[in-house]
Regions:
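Short, solvent-exposed loop/beta-turn-alpha elements that line the ligand-binding surface or hinge
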Residues: 1-15, 64-70, 90-125, 154-172
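Append "and occasionally in soluble cytosolic enzymes with long acidic Gly/Pro-rich linkers
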Residues: 1-42, 131, 138
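Active-site lining segments that contact anionic ligands and/or coordinate catalytic metals
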Residues: 14-19, 71-72, 147-149
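Periplasmic binding protein-like
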Residues: 21, 45-99
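Solvent-exposed loop/turn segments at secondary-structure junctions
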Residues: 25-29, 58-60, 79-84, 141-142, ...
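Stable alpha-helical elements in mature extracytoplasmic
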Residues: 29-43, 59, 63, 75, ...
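Sec-exported extracytoplasmic/periplasmic mature domains
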Residues: 41-49, 68-71, 80, 92, ...
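Surface-exposed patches in mature extracellular/periplasmic domains of secreted proteins
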Residues: 51-56, 131, 135, 154
Length: 172
């Protein structure tokens, strides 16, 4: 980007001065990422960049259609995973082994990284949780280097109870 006096004045070849991000909430700013995206829009506007927020009411339908058509410039979505997540669905690219085809990886990021694929398959083949954590950490480092996503929040399974109704000394 060309920057003059702290403002973007021109985009490089193949880039634009504005992009649209599709948010899959209910169309009322209720997606967990909506606030951070709104703040990013304001910050980018200060330097001359326009981020268009398309907060759709049909959520994943619009995003899914856009992703499948290859027209989504930017998008946000929450992936669900088990406590020991298998990364194949999201990041695996080897078509011969279930990537980028029906029943395999969604391949939305378009990453084709043999090292990442090998680490995913190696982790998938082990039942050792400690070993899998090490491999998944390596995978996440590679994914961060690809800069295809920005992790915005993390959910953790939790149990909520009232200590007035549950004797906490009985919890193990």
């Amino acid at each position: 980007y060309t920057v003059e006096n702290g403002k973007i004045t021109a985009a490089p070849e193949g880039a634009k001065m504005e992009y649209e991000i599709v948010v899959p909430g209910g169309g009322i700013g209720d997606d967990p990422n909506f606030m951070i995206i709104s703040m990013a829009k304001d910050a980018l506007a200060e330097i001359g960049f326009n981020l268009i927020i398309n907060d759709v009411s049909d959520g994943t339908v619009t995003i899914g259609n856009n992703l499948n058509a290859g027209t989504a410039e930017l998008w946000t979505m929450a992936w669900s995973a088990t406590p020991d997540p298998d990364m194949t669905q999201i990041y695996y690219s080897d078509v011969a082994n279930g990537g980028a085809n029906a029943g395999g990886s969604s391949h939305y990021y378009g990453i084709k990284d043999e090292n990442l694929d090998n680490l995913i398959m190696e982790a998938r083949a082990s039942l050792d949780q400690t070993y899998r954590k090490v491999l998944y950490k390596e995978c996440l480092d590679i994914i961060a280097d690809w800069a295809c996503e920005i992790p915005c929040y993390q959910r953790v399974d939790c149990t909520v109870f009232s200590s007035e109704r549950v004797n906490t000394s009985t919890i193990t």
